[in-house]
């Protein structure tokens, strides 16, 4: 019964998990460094993953520990902060595997004793209360767990852990299918969803019962495993025996010893005693002789057990004396242990486990635990056993060597002492019995010499690039001779048999030509011209929505001497007459303007004063609106004084009222003080005596007597009655505290008053002027400043400068996303106007989807990949030379996951100066230093060009560069400009649900910190406090430690920068904040940690996360924010479906609200009116026909007018009936006029989600994510910026620079993508400069620990990716060989090769990259893409054109060259140009394997789901294609293995011989005095490129040729592994050897054409699926165009088949 319950429920759990697997996100786990996401690793999952690793052989302990440590070090190097958890119950799963019990125990001890990793072993099970509490306290972001165990029962244990983690809102990361590169670890993430929590709540009892049943079953395993070996001995008896053995050893070896010796002698002695007892229990009677005899054929004698123990002791002595370098050369014995040996070995493993379980209890004993990782080496044991039973008996007698022999005798004699119960044999001979321990095999020793090892050596190549880049290492490399078969068999440039009519060498059109031209730039067609005009009009309209800057007309200027704007200008000694007249005129004009403004104020003053009396707040708004438009200081002073008088009056009235007597509304007092601030700061010089008296009186009324006295000292002392009377108006707190606590967001910022003639729209800050100076001096700069701080202005100034200099200079703006490209293009077109020569335009765009005016514009806006295409295009160099400046926006993408290396290429290829902008870089100094080194390189190159130019001029020849290129003298300096101050403060709030309503609790930034964090890292540099939060911090410090020495000094009223200060400024508040932070830090450093901890705890909010599904409360959250006047807001979620669903849920909420308000008969009336309207329309149409035929015009005109009037009336009534009430929409109807609204809606009429977005927009709602078309995104962006939309849900697409400022930002979904970087980018949108004085950030359904980590985590450091690929090398050689300007081309190529960020200041990495470059050349030459001089040939153009898809591009061309596509693409009948559906489907199958690779987790294969439309799992490649792919992969791996063997010389062998994490070394002097050691360790060949630890499992270099070999078998310090080999796996396996199937989404869609089918069966998100299919369709189209260009035969079957497929696929895609 129990088993049935367990089976049924476990199947239900398993199905739930399997159902989630295809939806798993395969993504990078780490983006943060320093206190990043805290996560957990299930220790048993880690153990299972490593022992099931393909390269690992059971019993090789040291290799196992190396795998564990290498994995953990990889996590740590990527910023991982984790704890490893071993549950006590998990041990039950190993009772059938005693060898793993001891390995697990050793692993736990090793991690605890020899590393700093936090290891937890106290939790009994995942269902325990302690575990639940731990999860609540630490809130790990995810748990790494295995999806499959060693057997079904262990798999069920893992399933319980997964289900429980989900129930606790902890995400799960699968240990299978993980891949790692230089910066990222990619894994399958299964997020915790509400449905998982529901499942756990519903099945709470079932889960408990099933878990108990499972444990009972595992407990029975323990008994059944022990009984046959230990008989009646119980668990506790054996434990006691083990304890006694160790205790006895402490007496024998009181001085202590090494764990390997201790483990050896104790486990051997316990094994012998247990086996002795085991044999005794088998004796038929007690009266027999004491000599033990074999009871039956399955039971070996005690002597055989002794022999095994002797061999084990000798093995351990080998471990003690042989360094890893020698052990890594051990012979590989392939024989297995004989069947009769199994009981002995099982018992020995159990004894080892019991010894290890007890060893840590002897902590007082001097036991060295360093070598816990090296207790067993089964391969070495087999080697020794093989020698003694196969070689020694045949007459091969080899000495052990004195040292080894002595140590062995010492160990065996100790075993003898520990046994005591009976006599054991002498140390020698080692074998006294003749039973074979190993099975007999024909070839028991693996012969590596028979394995195929590629011929070491490079093909000779001669090229300028090769010599310049890798020339210094060529002399040390082995090269093949010219008569070597590899060289003589090189593919010559010839026409391939299958491709007779193909011109493979013909230059292809590049990506620029391919990308869709939005309109023909040279066309004179009126329709085209009209579409161009419409486009430019819309762009200006779009640009106008981005900013309210008037367009500037640019006029090209002649080059003048530069002015220095930073210093003061010297006055002239004498003014000319003209200057005097001009000055007088200006004065007169100013006086006239002032008079007008005074008249205007006189006209408005009465109404504003009345408004101030009726409603102070609306009156203040009108007053401030007037102040914004007024320029006269005198008039402004009058207005401010009126405002101050009104505010004081309102305050006095309020204090006298009943309400004011109980609780005072301090917002009125804030308005009083705000007016005083304004008067004192801006108009201090204009104030009269009466004005000062009024201000002083106001201060007295507020209770700030000291401030009043300092401003206007009282002449007469006031009597007590007056003082008492005035006390009732006092705010009750000191002026400093009042200003900080209640006026923080109003505090005046220190801004410069002096305008800069270079900028008209605003007065730039000092740091912004520094940027302008950079541009003026033609310098480069890295600019790091917060979001919305104004760093982009430097970009537009840079553009303006280039536009003014000439008509042909170009500035390139590189943006990371298409959304940002569209936005910047619109801004440029709105900002600047310029009359240019015919054919030239001001602004152009180039993205992969479309382009316009890209090469005939002066400002090009593009994405990195497209700019790289232009820089690497051999025939675009003349255009590239026109570039004067490049602006890189969001340059931190250099450290991203996808396309990061492209940013590197661009930064090193450009010769001109650049601006690199970012809000989030934590190591800008390192980045700047690297970029400066690149600029020094270009300085040298430019000098060479100048010298060449001079010599060419001397001989009368033209220079290669435009004349003005060298005239505009650029600087090679790279400046770093840092600015850390946000204009607006951000305050954070946590949302919680109480009694069905949403509550907000303020989250103080210090609540995110711990004393440990402050001690280790200090306060994060960008963790700032608002003035109110500074006061809260002081109050908390004072409350916790009232007698703290500096309490009075840091009291707000006494603080040095506030003391008796009337106007406290923002900078003063910042100084106070810094003082408090420094004081709290000193508390921690001076031993007052507990007080500091209590302060931080005191600042934490009390709100708890609600257990319910908070996303269902999302509409309520939005409604609450509206009531609090916190809209417009951006709501960030991280799944496309969630973004759309959240927006839809808010719309549904408003619709339901409207329905409850609609009168009962409203729908019926609307229906009646709609019917009437239809009839009237018909009547009007009929009347028109009658009018055309009839002669009686007058009567007909009257009839028409009546119909039209009725029509208009009905339309108005119907509109009124259907009108959305104001409280049922979030749209601000006043923000946008109807015409603008219709224009925006009109653009999305034919878009996929157009109608849906329009319906949402009418309610003031929108959504924004990557799968939307750019027109759909523009609708949301424009209407949000104009204020019409006030609720927008979005993914991280808005984080990268898109200009959508708002009042509030809400994080409404936890995700792996919500990291420190994205948090800063997204939260930076809150608080619109000039509109909001403060920004608000809300956390909705984000756990407290996660919030803390987001606030305190540093942003990622920028670190270099692996910079090279085979296709990049081909593209570089193509540029060097075919470039229009060979010198410039070669300089660019060398810059890319020499200046990767990865190799900066890393000479060893540079040497490795040089070798990788040579490996790439070797492959390209062999495959016929390059000749031996480095010139492109064959299908080099097609391969480089498909560079996005390496290695699929290389495989595709090899299929083409081998004629496989010609064999496949056979038409339905001879002479036909049409291909059958079967041919098309096979073609899609092949292309899906190449360009549509999306893997399922391996465990999903076990699922038994019914699929309705899709096949889901992609079939294998057709046999001929599969064979060709295997051949291609073998060629690649042969070359790559050669490369790895050569590059292994660069390895740091000191590091290679130590464990990566614990740094335990296995080095030492090799043993040379032992003949046996020399004999056993004789396998030195073929073990050069792989780690010596990996060699312990019998691996060789030739294993690298096998595609299933894991990436990390290679040497760790060479900086490259097998993932850099461009192989394309026909079948992919995880590290345990399980097959990972491909998702057949592309082929399934081609068959059924349904996105819904992909959502239901293929488990894809609709938006993701559409995006992937579009990408697939673009690739097919690109290939189709390339093939058409390369083939001169119009009727070639392959070309026709691809054209048919492209057309059909696009037709299907356009229908969805």
Swiss-Prot record:
Record-listed E.C. numbers: 3.6.4.13
UniProt-listed Pfam families: DEAD (PF00270), Helicase_C (PF00271), PIN-like_DDX60 (PF23002)
Q: Which reaction does it catalyse?
A: ATP + H2O = ADP + phosphate + H(+)
* InterPro entries, alphabetized: DEAD/DEAH_box_helicase_dom (IPR011545), Helicase_ATP-bd (IPR014001), Helicase_C-like (IPR001650), P-loop_NTPase (IPR027417), PIN-like_DDX60 (IPR055124), SKI2_subfamily_helicases (IPR052431)
* UniProt subcellular location: Cytoplasm
The Helicase ATP-binding domain, residue ranges = 772-939
Tell me a GO cellular component: cytoplasm
Q: Where is this motif: DEVH box?
A: 889-892
Alphabetically ordered keywords of this record: Antiviral defense, ATP-binding, Cytoplasm, Helicase, Hydrolase, Immunity, Innate immunity, Nucleotide-binding, RNA-binding
Extract the coiled-coil ranges from the record.
Answer: none
In the induction comment, the record states: By interferon (IFN). Up-regulated during vesicular stomatitis virus (VSV), or poliovirus (PV) infection.
Question: Which tissues and organs express this gene's product?
Answer: Brain, lymph node, prostate, stomach, thyroid, tongue, trachea, uterus, skeletal muscle, spleen, kidney, liver and small intestine.
Provide the assembly information: Interacts with EXOSC1, EXOSC4, RIGI, IFIH1/MDA5 and DHX58/LGP2.
The UniProt entry's sequence similarity note says: Belongs to the helicase family.
Listed name of the protein? Probable ATP-dependent RNA helicase DDX60
- Print the organism lineage: Eukaryota, Metazoa, Chordata, Craniata, Vertebrata
């Amino acid at each position: 019964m129990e088993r049935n319950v367990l089976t049924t429920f476990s199947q239900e759990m398993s199905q739930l998990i399997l159902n989630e697997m295809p939806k798993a996100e395969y993504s990078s786990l780490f983006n943060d460094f320093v206190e990043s996401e805290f996560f957990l690793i299930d220790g048993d999952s880690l153990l299972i993953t490593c022992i099931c690793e393909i390269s690992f052989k059971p019993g090789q302990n040291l290799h196992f520990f190396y795998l564990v440590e290498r994995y953990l070090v990889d996590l740590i190097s990527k910023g991982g902060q984790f704890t490893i958890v071993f549950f006590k119950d998990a041990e039950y799963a190993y009772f059938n595997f005693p060898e793993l019990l001891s390995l697990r125990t050793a692993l736990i001890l090793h991690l605890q004793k020899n590393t700093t990793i936090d290891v937890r072993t106290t939790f009994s099970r995942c269902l325990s209360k302690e575990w639940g509490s731990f999860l609540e306290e630490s809130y790990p972001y995810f748990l790494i767990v295995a999806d499959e165990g060693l057997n079904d029962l262990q798999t069920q244990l893992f399933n319980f852990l997964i289900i429980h983690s989900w129930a606790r809102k902890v995400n799960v990361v699968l240990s299978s299918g993980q891949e790692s590169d230089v910066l990222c670890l990619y894994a399958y993430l299964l997020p915790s969803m509400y449905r998982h929590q529901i499942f756990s709540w519903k099945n709470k009892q079932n889960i408990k019962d099933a878990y108990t049943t499972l444990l009972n079953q595992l407990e029975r395993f323990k008994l059944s495993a022990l009984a046959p070996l230990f008989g009646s001995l119980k668990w506790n008896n054996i434990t006691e025996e083990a304890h006694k053995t160790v205790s006895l050893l402490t007496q024998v070896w009181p001085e202590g010893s090494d764990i390997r010796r201790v483990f050896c002698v104790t486990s051997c002695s316990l094994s012998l005693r247990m086996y002795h007892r085991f044999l005794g229990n088998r004796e038929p009677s007690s009266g027999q002789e004491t000599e033990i005899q074999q009871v039956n054929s399955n039971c070996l004698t005690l002597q055989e057990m002794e022999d095994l123990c002797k061999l084990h002791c000798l093995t351990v002595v080998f471990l003690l004396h042989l360094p890893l370098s020698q052990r890594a050369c051990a012979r590989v014995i392939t024989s297995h242990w004989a069947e009769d040996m199994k009981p002995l070995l099982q018992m020995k493993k159990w004894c080892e486990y019991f010894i290890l379980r007890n060893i840590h209890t002897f902590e007082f004993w001097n036991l060295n635990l360093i070598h816990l990782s090296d207790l067993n080496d089964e391969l070495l044991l087999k080697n020794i056993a093989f020698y003694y039973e196969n070689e020694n008996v045949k007459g091969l007698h080899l000495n052990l060597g004195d040292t080894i022999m002595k140590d062995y005798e010492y160990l065996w004699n100790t075993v003898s002492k520990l046994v005591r119960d009976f006599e054991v044999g002498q140390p020698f001979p080692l074998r006294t019995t003749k039973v074979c321990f190993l099975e007999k095999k024909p070839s028991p020793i693996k012969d590596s010499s028979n394995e195929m090892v590629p011929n070491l050596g490079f093909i000779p190549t001669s090229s300028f690039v090769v010599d310049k880049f890798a020339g210094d290492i060529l002399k040390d490399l082995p090269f093949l001779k010219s008569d070597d078969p590899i060289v003589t068999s090189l593919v010559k440039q010839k026409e391939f048999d299958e491709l007779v009519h193909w011109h493979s060498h013909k230059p292809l059109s590049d990506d620029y030509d391919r990308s869709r031209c939005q309109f023909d730039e040279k066309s004179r067609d009126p329709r085209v011209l009209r579409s161009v005009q419409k486009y430019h009009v819309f762009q200006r309209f779009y640009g106008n929505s981005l900013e309210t800057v008037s367009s500037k007309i640019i006029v090209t200027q002649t080059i003048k001497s530069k002015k220095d704007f930073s210093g003061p200008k010297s006055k002239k000694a004498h003014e000319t007459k003209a200057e005097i007249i001009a000055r007088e005129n200006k004065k007169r004009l100013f006086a006239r303007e002032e008079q007008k403004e005074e008249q205007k104020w006189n006209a408005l003053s009465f109404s504003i004063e009345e408004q101030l009396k009726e409603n102070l707040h609306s009156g203040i708004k009108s007053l401030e609106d007037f102040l914004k438009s007024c320029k006269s200081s005198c008039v402004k002073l009058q207005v401010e004084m009126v405002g101050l008088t009104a505010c004081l009056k309102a305050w006095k009235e309020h204090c006298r009222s009943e309400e004011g007597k109980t609780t005072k509304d301090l917002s009125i007092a804030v308005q009083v003080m705000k007016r005083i601030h304004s008067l004192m700061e801006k108009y201090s010089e204009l104030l009269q005596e009466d004005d000062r008296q009024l201000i002083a009186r106001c201060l007295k009324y507020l209770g700030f007597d000291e401030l009043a006295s300092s401003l206007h000292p009282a002449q007469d002392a006031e009597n007590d009655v007056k003082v008492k009377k005035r006390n009732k108006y006092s705010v009750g707190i000191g002026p400093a505290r009042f200003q900080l606590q209640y006026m923080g967001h109003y505090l005046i910022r220190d801004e410069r008053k002096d305008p800069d003639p270079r900028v008209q729209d605003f007065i730039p800050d000092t740091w912004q002027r520094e940027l302008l100076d950079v541009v003026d001096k033609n310098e480069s700069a890295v600019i790091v400043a917060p979001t919305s701080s104004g760093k982009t202005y430097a970009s537009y100034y840079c553009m303006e400068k280039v536009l003014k200099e000439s008509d042909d200079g170009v500035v390139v703006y590189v943006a990371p996303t298409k959304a940002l490209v569209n936005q910047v293009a619109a801004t440029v077109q709105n900002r600047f106007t310029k009359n240019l020569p015919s054919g030239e335009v001001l602004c152009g765009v180039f993205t992969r989807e479309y382009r316009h005016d890209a090469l005939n514009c002066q400002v090009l806006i593009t994405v990195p990949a497209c700019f790289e295409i232009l820089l690497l295009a051999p025939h675009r160099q003349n255009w590239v030379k026109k570039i004067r400046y490049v602006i890189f926006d969001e340059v931190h993408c250099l450290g991203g996951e996808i396309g990061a290396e492209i940013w590197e290429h661009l930064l090193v290829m450009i010769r001109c100066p650049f601006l690199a902008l970012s809000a989030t870089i934590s190591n800008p100094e390192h980045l700047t230093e690297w970029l400066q080194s690149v600029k020094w390189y270009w300085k040298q190159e430019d000098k060479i060009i100048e010298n060449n130019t001079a010599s060419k001029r001397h001989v009368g020849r033209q220079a290669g560069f435009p004349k003005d290129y060298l005239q505009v003298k650029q600087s090679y300096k790279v400046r770093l400009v840092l600015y850390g101050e946000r204009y607006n403060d951000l305050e954070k709030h946590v949302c919680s649900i109480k009694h069905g309503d949403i509550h907000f609790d303020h989250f103080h930034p210090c609540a995110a910190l711990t004393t440990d964090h402050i001690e280790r890292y200090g306060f994060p540099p960008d963790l700032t406090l608002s003035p109110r939060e500074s006061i809260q911090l002081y109050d908390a410090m004072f409350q916790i430690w009232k007698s703290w020495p500096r309490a009075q000094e840091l009291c707000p009223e006494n603080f040095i920068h506030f003391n008796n200060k009337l106007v406290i400024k923002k900078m003063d508040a910042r100084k106070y904040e810094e003082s408090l932070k420094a004081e709290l830090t000193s508390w921690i450093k001076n031993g007052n940690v507990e007080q500091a901890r209590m302060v931080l705890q005191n600042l934490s909010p009390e709100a708890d996360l609600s257990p319910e599904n908070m996303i269902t409360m999302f509409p309520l959250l939005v409604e609450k924010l509206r009531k609090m006047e916190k809209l417009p807001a951006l709501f960030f979620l991280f799944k496309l479906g969630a973004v759309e669903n959240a927006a839809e849920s808010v719309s549904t909420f408003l619709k339901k609200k409207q329905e409850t308000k609609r009168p009962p008969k409203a729908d019926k009336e609307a229906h009646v009116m709609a019917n009437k309207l239809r009839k009237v329309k018909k009547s009007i149409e009929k009347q028109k026909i009658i009018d055309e035929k009839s002669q009686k015009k007058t009567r007909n005109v009257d009839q028409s007018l009546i119909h039209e009037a009725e029509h208009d009336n009905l339309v108005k009534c119907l509109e009124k009936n259907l009108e959305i009430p104001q409280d049922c929409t979030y749209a601000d109807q006043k923000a946008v006029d109807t015409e603008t609204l219709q224009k925006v809606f009109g653009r999305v009429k034919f878009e996929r989600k157009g109608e849906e977005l329009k319906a949402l927009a009418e309610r003031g709602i929108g959504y924004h994510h990557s799968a939307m078309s750019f027109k759909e995104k523009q609708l949301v962006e424009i209407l949000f910026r104009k204020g019409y939309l006030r609720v927008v849900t979005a993914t991280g697409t808005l984080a990268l620079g898109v200009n959508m400022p708002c009042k509030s930002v809400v994080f409404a979904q936890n995700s792996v993508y919500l990291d420190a970087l994205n948090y800063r980018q997204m939260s930076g949108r809150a608080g619109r400069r000039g509109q909001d004085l403060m920004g608000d950030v809300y956390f909705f359904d984000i756990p407290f620990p996660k919030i803390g980590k987001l606030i305190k985590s540093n942003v990622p450091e920028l670190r270099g990716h692996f910079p090279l690929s085979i296709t990049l090398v081909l593209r570089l050689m193509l540029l060097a060989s075919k470039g229009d300007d060979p010198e410039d081309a070669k300089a660019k190529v060398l810059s890319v090769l020499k200046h990767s960020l990865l190799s900066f200041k890393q000479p060893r990495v540079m040497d490795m990259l040089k070798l990788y470059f040579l490996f790439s050349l070797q492959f390209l030459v062999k495959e016929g893409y390059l000749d031996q001089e480095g010139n492109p040939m064959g299908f080099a153009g097609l391969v480089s054109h498909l560079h996005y898809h390496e290695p699929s591009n290389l495989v595709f061309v090899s299929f083409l060259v081998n004629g496989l596509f010609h064999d496949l693409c056979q038409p339905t009948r001879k002479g036909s140009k049409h291909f059958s559906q079967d041919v098309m489907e096979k073609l899609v199958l092949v292309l899906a394997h190449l360009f549509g690779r999306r893997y399922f987790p391996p465990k999903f294969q076990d699922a038994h789901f019914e699929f309705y439309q899709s096949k889901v799992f992609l079939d294998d490649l057709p046999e001929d294609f599969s064979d060709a792919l295997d051949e291609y992969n073998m060629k690649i791996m042969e070359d790559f293995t050669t490369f790895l063997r050569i590059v292994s010389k660069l390895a740091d062998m000191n590091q290679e011989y130590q464990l990566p994490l614990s740094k335990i070394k296995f080095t030492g002097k090799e043993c040379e005095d032992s003949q046996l050691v020399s004999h056993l360790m004789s396998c030195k060949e073929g073990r050069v490129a792989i780690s010596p630890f990996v060699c312990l499992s019998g691996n060789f270099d030739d294993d690298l040729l096998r595609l299933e070999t894991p990436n990390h078998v290679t040497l760790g310090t060479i900086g490259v592994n097998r993932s850099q080999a461009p192989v394309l796996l026909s079948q992919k396996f995880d590290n345990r050897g399980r097959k990972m199937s491909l998702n057949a989404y592309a082929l399934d869609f081609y068959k059924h054409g349904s996105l819904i089918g992909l959502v239901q069966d293929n488990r894809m998100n609709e938006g993701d699926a559409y995006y992937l299919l579009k990408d697939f369709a673009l690739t097919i189209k690109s290939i189709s165009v390339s093939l058409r260009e390369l083939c001169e035969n119009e009727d070639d079957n392959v070309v026709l088949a691809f054209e048919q497929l492209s057309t059909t696929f696009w037709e299907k895609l356009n229908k969805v």
